[in-house]
């Protein structure tokens, strides 16, 4: 488990997050939601080891994260950042092989190549191995970088677990690519990995996550199972907009619908547009 306890981050005179506690548990997918500026990415950067907290403690599988070498951390957790655009003509397979760097001494071996190919297959990109990454669509590129992250932690360590940290993995993706990316992450969690995903779409969080952390103003407003925290009062208080929460017609998760009428919103006559 990645355990974050009473995390506070100060940058200059600004406090980005304050006394935040959360966890990424093996076999579960945790979604972090909240309005812009709530501190979601800061929390992920602390969980990944990229950012050292001003106060609080971070542990990875019951050991202080800072006590692990960068290589040891990289063999246990992989990060998919918000922006992963690549402008150089690397092939898809070359990019995915970069994920094997923490495991390689010298050149990649047959096992590394096999893992890279398996990771591409996991994100439904097996037929793209020889394509240059800049020639792919944005959604295809995102899946390639997800495959790179999966390849990095493909095999569980002997003395711990794997963790996949995703910072807005569905941003700017169409419906099909959003579902493909999060279904892949969900499957990875079902295989025993811990997954942390920052999401803006509350319905995606409700659909895929086991646990939801709702952040606001640099702190945790609520956390728990999707149905227990993605409620009309919580959403209205955090996001400043009323919603209706319905039973999903085909899945066992909440369905969140913005309530424009309750907010006093007006609908334009479509004939006047």
Curated annotation (Swiss-Prot):
Q: Where does ATP bind?
A: 34-41
Q: Which Pfam families match?
A: ABC_tran
Localisation: Cell inner membrane
Provide any one GO MF term from the record: ATP binding
Task: Report the function annotation for this chain.
Answer: Part of the ABC transporter complex HmuTUV involved in hemin import. Responsible for energy coupling to the transport system.
Q: How does it assemble?
A: The complex is composed of two ATP-binding proteins (HmuV), two transmembrane proteins (HmuU) and a solute-binding protein (HmuT).
What name is this protein filed under?
A: Hemin import ATP-binding protein HmuV
What lineage, starting at the top, does this entry show?
Bacteria, Pseudomonadati, Rhodothermota, Rhodothermia, Rhodothermales
